[in-house]
Amino acid sequence: MDITKHTRALFVTTMLALGILVAGVAIGACGDDDGAAGEGAAQTAVGNGIDRAFVADMTPHHRSAVQMAKIAERRGQRRFVKDLASDISRTQNAEITTMQRIASRLDAAGVKAASLGIPEHQMGMDTDLSKLRTADPFDRAFIDMMIPHHQAAIRMGHVELAKGSSAEAKRLAKQIIAAQTREIEAMNKHRSEEFGGPSPAGGVPAQDENEGGEGDDGMSSKDHG
């Protein structure tokens, strides 16, 4: 038997086996990387902590606006206020439904709420509905209460646009900003015409207000679930 030929054949066979083994390990590793990348992409597509905070904070904020609008539909003294209240109620109820859908998707993906970074006093949630029910003149009181409420929603929308990642939440934020910007301008115009000047709350907030906030992993002080 030719020992040299046998040794060479054994060497070649061994190297081929090692090559197949290495290739298999490499393919497996690539598969793991692809899986991890896929999971990461899916998470990004669903949204991040800012998206979750945006819908968590905006949903009760919208409900508060709808409550105010319902009072205005009954007590409004001028057609402008009654029509505006009806529009707010219809639009924001529809947006609440959209936010609930977004929240369900984020919750299913395990996304936890971060913080929008907006001070509590700028969130527009300190509305006194009992005071509004007895206000006189009602229309002026309604405008003076709804404008800061809208300002808060616009601030939240700007944070979502700056730091959120959900395409659907961003579309909603743009929609909210556009609608409530128009409404603030219309309310101040009406107040100036009927009551001698715009609301002391001011006008549309600047875009760069409160676009900060914690990162995606920063938890809100509220437990949004």
Q: What are these regions, as identified by a protein language model?
A:
Residues 3-16:
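Bacterial N-terminal signal peptides that target proteins for export
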